[in-house]
Every structure is written in C-alpha cells, then in structure tokens.
Amino acid sequence: MIIRSPEPEVKILVDRDHIKTSFEEWARPGHFSRTIAKGPETTTWIWNLHADAHDFDSHTSDLEEISRKVFSAHFGQLSIIFLWLSGMYFHGARFSNYEAWLSDPTHIRPSAQVVWPIVGQEILNGDVGGGFRGIQITSGFFQIWRASGITSELQLYCTAIGGLVFAALMLFAGWFHYHKAAPKLAWFQDVESMLNHHLAGLLGLGSLSWAGHQVHVSLPINQFLNAGVDPKEIPLPHEFILNRDLLAQLYPSFAEGATPFFTLNWSKYADFLTFRGGLDPVTGGLWLTDTAHHHLAIAILFLIAGHMYRTNWGIGHGLKDILEAHKGPFTGQGHKGLYEILTTSWHAQLSLNLAMLGSLTIVVAHHMYAMPPYPYLATDYGTQLSLFTHHMWIGGFLIVGAAAHAAIFMVRDYDPTTRYNDLLDRVLRHRDAIISHLNWACIFLGFHSFGLYIHNDTMSALGRPQDMFSDTAIQLQPVFAQWIQNTHALAPGATAPGATASTSLTWGGGDLVAVGGKVALLPIPLGTADFLVHHIHAFTIHVTVLILLKGVLFARSSRLIPDKANLGFRFPCDGPGRGGTCQVSAWDHVFLGLFWMYNSISVVIFHFSWKMQSDVWGSISDQGVVTHITGGNFAQSSITINGWLRDFLWAQASQVIQSYGSSLSAYGLFFLGAHFVWAFSLMFLFSGRGYWQELIESIVWAHNKLKVAPATQPRALSIVQGRAVGVTHYLLGGIATTWAFFLARIIAVG
C-alpha cells in the first residue's frame, strides 16, 4: 500500500450548460451526421440512419463527448427499464389473480394478462383456477412478489406508480447530465472513485437494504403465509418496521435489539439469519432466512471492498499500480498499459463487462432451478423452463456482444505503436498458435461427440442394442461430474457448521422435496446420455469461441489482408478486383458467431427441457412413488440422434401442433409464424445483392411507366445489411419457435 500526500481539495468535475436543448435539432433526422442530415436520396439512407444513430464514435472523435453521450443514454435505458417494471407491477395490480394465487399457490396458476374479446380471441383466456380466466404467465413475478412480502394488489399498484416516478426521474437525469451539468472526461476516468461508489454504494448498500427489507418485512410476512394465515389478516409492512414487539413474537432475538450485535454475541440472531441449506419443504424454495443471511454477508463483503481503493485520502490501492504489478515469468510486460486501454477505450471496458455479465447470466440460469430462490417457484414448471431458457439466451447474446466490442476496440481504439510486449501484444503475436490449436480442438470434439451418436444410431438401426454406448450396454459414465456431485452431497457435515442439507438437492443424498403432490427438486442422476450431450455442448461452445476469437485476433490484419484495420469494423470484401476476400471483416465474425451461439444454446435448453421432464419433474403419490412427466426416457432415448428427433422434438411438439381450438392456440400460431420468420431469413442469407438490384430496377421501370415512381431512389440492401437482416430473422424466428414449442408443451403437461 502506498501512502501519498493528500490531493488538492476541490476539483470542478462538470461543465455547465454544455449543449443547449433544442427540439428543432432533435426533429431533424440524422442531425448527428453531416451526410445523413442532408436527407434521403436513396433508400440506403434509412439503413444508415439506424446503423449510425447510436454509434457515437461516428459522430465525433472527442472521447469526452462520446463518454457524455453514453452516460446520458444509460439514464434513458434505466428509464425504459423502470417503465417496463412499472408495467409488470401494474398488470399484477390491475389484470391478475395474484391475491387468489397467494391463497392457494399449488392449485391456482399465475395469470396477469387478460385478452379483450374483439374477434373471438377470448378463447386464449384459459381457466387458471380460482374462478379466473386469463393467459398463464411464466415470468416468475408472482413468486418474487410473495418472497418480497407483497400481500395485496393495492401494494402492487403503489409500486407501479413508484416505478413511473423513477422512470421520469431517470429521463430527467439523462437530460440534466448532458445539457445542464455534463461530467468532464476526468470524472469518467476516475476509476478508484467509481469502484468505491459502485462496490460500497450499489452492491454494498443495495444488498444491505435488501437484507433489511427481507428481515423486517419479507420474513415475518412469509412466516404468516406459510402458516396459512389469510393475507388480509397479516399486519402491513410498516407495522413490522415500527413495532418491534410484533417481530419479537416471531423471532425472539428481536426483543434484545442491537445488544447481541455490539457484545459480539451474534449467534443470538440465528433465529432469522440461518445457514440451513436445502429447500423449505412448505414452499419448495430456498429458506428465506438463508437468503437474508446471504444478502447481509454479501453486503459486508462489498462494503469492505468499497473502501479498498485510493481516492482523496491518499490511502488504499491504485488500479494502475495493481495492474502494472501483474507480471508472470512468461508474460513480458504483463498488464502494463491495460489501465490506459480501459480508461480510454469504452469498447474494451464494455467487452470485459459483457463477457463477465454473460457468464454470470448463465450461472443465474443454472441456479434458478438448482437453488430455486422464491417460494413455489420450483413446482411452477412453466416458469422454471422459461427462466432457464431466457437466461441462457441472454447470456449467449451478451458473450457474442463481448467479442463484437473487443473487435471494435481492436479496429478503432488499439494503438500498436504504444503497445509492446504487454499481454495483449503477446497474445496477438502468437494468435496463429491459439487459433490453429482451437481449430484442432473443435475438429476433435466435433468428430468424437458426433461419432458417438452416429455409432449409436447405426447399432440401433441394425438391432444391436448390446453394442451401443448406454447405461445398460457399453457405459460411458461421467465420473468426474459424479465425483463433484458426491463431494457436494457429503459436504454439509464437513464444511458448514449447522447446515442441515447441501447447497442444492440436485447434488444427491436422497432428499426429495415435493409441494402439493408435485416434485420441487430431487437428486439429478447423470449417466451415459449426459456424457454424450455434454460433449456436444463442449463442441458447439468451442466452435463459437473459435469464430469470435478469430474475429478479434485478426480484426486489424491477417496474412490475407495485412491492412484490414484501414477497412474498418464492417466491410463486405476487400474491394473490387480482389477475389476470395469476402466475410473477413470483424463484423462478419460476429455475424457467423451468432449462428453458432444459437446452436450452442439450443442444445443446452433442449437438454435441460428433456432431462427435467424425464428425471426431475412429475407427481408423487401418497405412497411416495414419483411419476415423471416423460417417465425417465432421457437415459435410453437421447443417446441416438433419431431419439432426439422422435422422442423429444416430435413427441413433445404434439401439444403445440394440436393447440388449435384451445387456450394454447396462440402458441400454435406463433409456432407457425416463427417458422415462417426463420425461413424468411434464408432469402436474405442465400441471395446476393445483384439479384435484388436487377429485380428492383425492373419494378422501378414499371412505376415509371405508371408515373408513380418515388423521389427516393430504391436500392437493394448492401451485402452487410442483407446479412444483418438475415441473422436477425434467423435468430428471432428460431427463438420464438422454441418458445412456442416449450410453453405449449409445459403448460399442457406441467
């Protein structure tokens, strides 16, 4: 730790009235670009307008101005998020059966959307129980509301109004911090202050206030709800907060106030800050006393972390010093220069953040089913499937975004003259070794993982089940995964004092939690079938990484095109007269990477959906016999490609295909429509620009004949625009098809 003399006291960190507010300016399309502001001559103008509106780098090269625009845009984004959240709460208040669900969450299904009868579509309002007709929702909002202690639709209504107030506040802040008091560049680059505020403020105080809410409001209300008390009889949140005796009746240690805290007798608080592990048998969710304890612990960690970095007091760590101290025996200058990169290139910063947030989102997807955090979430199979699928897709997109912005950084912000022998330079210098090895790994994984399936299909087709890779013939058990499962199942006795169960029931140990005759969670067995599909996961993920990493490492130059940096981030080919140079831009790698990301995530969500229906989800009889939705057919059926097609895709599509005439029919229409959107994408992906330009000119001729030709000259999409439209429809169509397939199936059988 370095002690320095204190900094000068007051720095002026904002510019006042930096840019005047002008509605005339905003009303002029393309006001941010000299070329676009001239107005449309050809139809390409509208595409350029969309491509460049938020590409602040193209408006100006002044880093301070770019930073201010990004900062202001973030407030706009937050305002939209608050507006959306407010809408969710408003639907809960105005169009939902929340209060009915709260009184009987095992038999009544959540609904917060009611279709108006205009052309007979009120058929979509299915009977969700409790005398309510509406569309069953699978977002998990009801479960979150119960966990936070919301007991009436009036409370939802008030929260919705609060959301609108915050949305307005954010819009104002976005305007204020760009037009009235715009921060200087030095403020954006003061990373130590930023870390302290984000760690201690957002994460530390955020977690602490949530822990406080859980202890003083959620826990007591949920305690009453679990005991079967009518929600209308439960005291209101402010009564618990203001009246300590109320809480002391439920949690005796409250009677002692803060004395145990200051006398370090913390174990007194163990009645509401627990460390049990496992699930609450009443609700099938994590113990809320465990989650309150968790948020308190997280808050302490982040409050400490938020006091580690050196600001005005000359004490603590400096980020630059930390980075420059990172030097290994084989890493040359190590992290020297990284500080400058991350404080002057927001693309580099964003790339790191997207990579971490994407990975974290995928971790969340897995925790939502393995450790279901909210009451009655685990037995709501539609919501479980939706939350997993949603977080997997989002994680995939964020990780591709990380590669996109890393490549933009390489093209626009990387300065090779100042970087020598630091880690990034060394990675770039042996990029051929990295990419060729990665390519070898992809080939190995592809042939071997696919080969195992092809072997099984062949043996199955020839009627030789004894020669197949399966749990009953030639076993390929995932021994490492099973070892990890067993270690965790045995851990509570050895690691966490007072923990009565392991972190997740999925690890093993024979415990099963069922709520209202439905399985919430049980140990998930892994076998040969999982071993096979896990290697498909490894294959698709490695190919995605290969494409994206090649795009980043060869963004500035390659043997084929040494001056690639001069061509920019996205370009169709290296100019006329140079054949075989198409699809080499960094943008094209992102484009191709998106398809493989789609492959990867599709296999993951198919695996999850079938595995859970086969081995986890189902009903339990009074005798304790579990009947799974698909009767445990995953282990024997998913070991052939034919099995995936026959017993998963085809067998489980019957609900969506036969949904016409029922309340699920919207999913049938979506299934059809999304297939069409997906097929429509192929038209953009398989045809070249010239084909369309010829067709357009013929159509323009006809318009001229009839004297109805437009003033703006029609143009075919550019090559890059065509690819962008193609991949968008491909992903949108594919994801919406999967969504309709999953939901119609799980709502019908779950």
Swiss-Prot record:
Signal peptide: none annotated. GO terms for molecular function: 4 iron, 4 sulfur cluster binding; chlorophyll binding; electron transfer activity; magnesium ion binding; oxidoreductase activity. [4Fe-4S] cluster binds at C573, C582. It comes from the Eukaryota. P700 is a chlorophyll a/chlorophyll a' dimer, A0 is one or more chlorophyll a, A1 is one or both phylloquinones and FX is a shared 4Fe-4S iron-sulfur center. One of its GO terms (cellular component) is chloroplast thylakoid membrane. The chain crosses the membrane at residues 70-93, 156-179, 195-219, 291-309, 346-369, 385-411, 433-455, 531-549, 589-610, 664-686, 724-744. Keywords: 4Fe-4S, Chlorophyll, Chloroplast, Chromophore, Electron transport, Iron, Iron-sulfur, Magnesium, Membrane, Metal-binding, Oxidoreductase, Photosynthesis, Photosystem I, Plastid, Thylakoid, Transmembrane, Transmembrane helix, Transport. PsaA and PsaB bind P700, the primary electron donor of photosystem I (PSI), as well as the electron acceptors A0, A1 and FX. PSI is a plastocyanin-ferredoxin oxidoreductase, converting photonic excitation into a charge separation, which transfers an electron from the donor P700 chlorophyll pair to the spectroscopically characterized acceptors A0, A1, FX, FA and FB in turn. Oxidized P700 is reduced on the lumenal side of the thylakoid membrane by plastocyanin. Belongs to the PsaA/PsaB family. This is Photosystem I P700 chlorophyll a apoprotein A1. The lineage of its organism: Eukaryota, Viridiplantae, Streptophyta, Embryophyta, Tracheophyta. The gene is psaA.
